[in-house]
């Protein structure tokens, strides 16, 4: 009757609606739930005809029954996966990974992310271009969820030789089998990763990819295995970012003097004001004390990029406001002031230098239209899929401004698109040069420990140590790892995290550290298109040689093969060793 009164065609056609009708309606619902655990189960039922439901049956009882059936099925699937994983041995893994034969690579991600699902897509595309079979595990629709059973079923069906995830490790996903090699790309700060539990959860076939400094923290502070950590940066896909013909009509819309792409449009003052609005009077005083210290640095025309400098301001804020610190509060304040407030101050300071230059400046990203000083330059959000490449190529100068450094995916994608960049100089970009010089001296002088390094009286060594202290904003010998371990790690990865080392003289030509330097370089490069083209091509070469998803993927597979070969060899040695008689 109600369907004659109400037009529910659109409602009933929605993918979120499951319609069970007729005399077998309940039986069909009962069978559907445990067989479709990715679909959220109903929590509320409205009964019109009680005869449809068996006596004593409610939606809660039905869900409990369905959960029991699903758990039984999960146990069965996990048993099958254990049988499959038992066929993997160190020797077989090493041989398979080094043979060049196609692997089955399962990538796990979520549609409820922004950047990460695109990064996983590009990573799997690199595996495919290298000849491997790939499958992505992702929620099939916006209303569906992943869980242990759905994940285990995907593994049982695809039978992966390698599982890859971003920002999650195996132990977080109980549906994943042990024994099959798994790689986590740690791209963001995640509390579960940065914890002793995260390190302790790493099994003998768990591998990590991540940044160089993060390796030092994860290995020496949280217990991650050093020999199963691959230092890299977030990759780029040259297949998705490539220059178009110069006469492509789509470029015309984006031609400008200078462009900058970022969603970091909120001013530092707005960020702090929003935080104050969520807290009591005592917290407001603490936030205000820290912010005034940080803002004074930028008001003086300076910058701060090293976390210890921010930490000291937070510690001073505790003293000034007589606030009792806790580790959790310190961590929250570090995230707020280092990752957000300082980021805004660093970026917006440089943008203010451009306002009066009379150039065609365009800002792409969310919220710029609301910024009182910059709203006239706002051009809306750029689509990552196609528009970004057009912006990079059409802009005479692209800017990259970040206190975290210039070896960023956006810069690499922009270079691959044919875009020229000016980079705001950061200490993190050039410290690799100091490390390289210092490592060279240590090698020549036979220095192998922190004690020897501190005791060295060579004036050049002392000068370089002083430079390291200035950049680190702290005692480099007071970390949870030794300074020599840091120097060794940076040397072993060929200073992959240092833009000054990767791009060499090109970095010096394209970086700026002051308003006067930025104005001078903008004027010069706007008038020299051939120089822009030369530097773009020169800076792209090391990107293609070292930072594409394919290069990183190849290095990962080589690391896994070598690691498992070592394990196999050690097992053979142990088996062949005859214990001495007592």
Task: Give the positions of each predicted feature.
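N-terminal donor/sugar-recognition subdomains of glycan-related enzymes
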Residues: 2-104, 134
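Extended catalytic core of nucleotide-activated donor transferases of GT-like folds
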Residues: 6, 92-96, 106-222, 240-243, ...
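Short, solvent-exposed loop/turn segments at secondary-structure junctions
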Residues: 111-114, 141-142, 168-171, 188-192, ...
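Catalytic core of nucleotide-activated saccharide and alditol-phosphate transferases
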Residues: 180-319, 551, 567, 575-578
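Conserved catalytic-core segment of nucleotide-activated headgroup transferases in glycan assembly
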Residues: 245-389, 393, 447, 452-453, ...
């Amino acid at each position: 009757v109600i369907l004659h009164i109400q037009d529910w065609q659109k409602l009933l056609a929605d993918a979120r609606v499951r319609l069970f009708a007729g005399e077998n309606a309940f039986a069909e619902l009962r069978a559907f739930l445990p067989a479709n655990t990715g679909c959220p189960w109903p929590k509320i039922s409205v009964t019109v005809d009680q005869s449809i439901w068996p006596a004593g049956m409610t939606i809660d009882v039905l869900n409990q029954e369905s959960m029991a059936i699903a758990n039984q099925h999960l146990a069965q699937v996990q048993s099958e996966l254990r049988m499959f994983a038992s066929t993997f041995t160190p020797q077989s893994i090493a041989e398979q990974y080094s043979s060049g034969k196609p692997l089955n690579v399962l990538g796990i991600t979520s549609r409820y992310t922004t950047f990460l699902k695109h990064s996983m897509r590009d990573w799997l595309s690199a595996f495919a271009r290298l000849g491997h079979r790939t499958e992505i595990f992702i929620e099939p629709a916006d209303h569906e969820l992943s869980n242990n059973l759905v994940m285990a079923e995907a593994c049982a069906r695809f039978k992966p030789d390698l599982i890859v995830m971003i920002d999650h490790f195996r132990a977080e996903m109980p549906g994943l089998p042990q024994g099959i090699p798994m790689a986590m790309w740690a791209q963001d700060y995640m509390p579960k990763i940065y914890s002793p539990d995260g390190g302790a959860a790493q099994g003998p076939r768990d591998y990590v990819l991540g940044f160089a400094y993060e390796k030092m923290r994860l290995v020496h502070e949280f217990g991650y295995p050093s020999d199963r950590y691959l230092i890299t940066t977030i990759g780029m896909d040259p297949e998705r970012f490539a220059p178009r013909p110069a006469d492509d009509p789509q470029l015309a819309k984006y031609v400008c003097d200078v462009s900058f792409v970022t969603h970091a449009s909120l001013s530092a003052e707005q960020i702090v004001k929003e935080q104050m609005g969520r807290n009591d009077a005592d917290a407001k005083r603490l936030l205000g004390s820290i912010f005034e210290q940080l803002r004074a640095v930028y008001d003086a025309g300076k910058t701060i990029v090293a976390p210890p400098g921010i930490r000291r301001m937070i510690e001073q804020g505790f003293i000034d406001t007589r606030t009792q610190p806790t580790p959790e509060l310190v961590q929250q304040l570090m995230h707020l002031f280092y990752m957000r407030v300082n980021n805004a101050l660093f970026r917006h300071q440089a943008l203010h230098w451009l306002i009066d230059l009379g150039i065609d400046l365009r800002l792409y990203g969310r919220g710029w239209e609301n910024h009182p000083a910059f709203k006239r330059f706002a051009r809306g959000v750029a689509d990552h899929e196609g528009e970004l490449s057009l912006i990079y190529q059409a802009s005479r100068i692209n800017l990259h401004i970040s206190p975290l450094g210039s070896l960023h995916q956006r810069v690499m994608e922009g270079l691959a698109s044919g875009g020229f960049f000016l980079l705001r100089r950061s200490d993190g970009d050039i410290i690799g040069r100091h490390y390289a010089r210092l490592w060279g001296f240590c090698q020549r002088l036979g220095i192998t420990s922190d004690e020897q390094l501190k005791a060295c009286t060579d004036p050049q060594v002392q000068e370089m140590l002083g430079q390291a202290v200035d950049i680190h904003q702290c005692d480099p010998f007071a970390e949870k790892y030794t300074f020599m371990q840091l120097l060794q790690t940076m040397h072993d990865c060929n200073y992959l995290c240092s833009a000054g080392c990767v791009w060499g003289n090109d970095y010096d030509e394209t970086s700026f550290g002051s308003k006067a330097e930025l104005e001078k370089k903008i004027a010069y490069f706007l008038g020299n298109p051939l120089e822009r083209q030369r530097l773009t091509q020169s800076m792209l070469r090391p990107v293609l040689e070292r930072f594409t998803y394919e290069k990183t993927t190849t290095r990962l597979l080589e690391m896994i093969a070598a690691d498992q070969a070592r394990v196999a060899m050690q097992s053979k040695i142990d088996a062949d060793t005859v214990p001495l008689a007592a």
